[in-house]
Amino acid sequence: MYSCNVLDEQYAGAMAEHGFVPEPDNRRYGSMGLCWRQAGPGGSGYFWTYGQQDLYMLKIHDFYFHEDQLLEFCWPESLSVTWYESISGEEFSPCRRLVSGCVKSFIGGREPYRALIHRRVPIVSIGIEITPAYYQDYLRRQFSEEFQSLLESFQSLDQTCLLYTSDAADD
């Protein structure tokens, strides 16, 4: 049985604002986690989250919007890394294109997240969001001698994109 935690609560307002409703009995992505369904007229699909206490959250995006959507919200302090199989849009800070085939990192808690998501392009991704309770406290206790700053590692990651060409597809 799924139980709500602090990490789920951070998404509730943003999800409701964009027409998503929680479906705690939806097992689309398994019995653990919370599935959200895009129930409004603005789009279709699902968003799934699974949080482990106040340590981390796994996320699956599998939805699209009928019209361009401006997303703007204050992301809590965290480190996020996400693989985008499909997406189209722009992030405003930092200014980067959102394109398919990218691994992107984001450091939350600094400034509001702002992005324009293009209409009718599915957002299909999987990611993990790691909280300070995990990357500053838990990892340091578990690996005190080997511990290196995960924050510094994320700052250097930024984004990595795979560019698909017709030549690569023929191999």
Could you say what each language-model-derived stretch is?
Residues 164-171:
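Conserved small/polar residues in nucleotide/adenosyl-binding loops
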Residues 35-160:
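N-terminal regulatory/effector-sensing and dimerization cores
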Residues 1-57, 64:
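Membrane-cytosol interface segments
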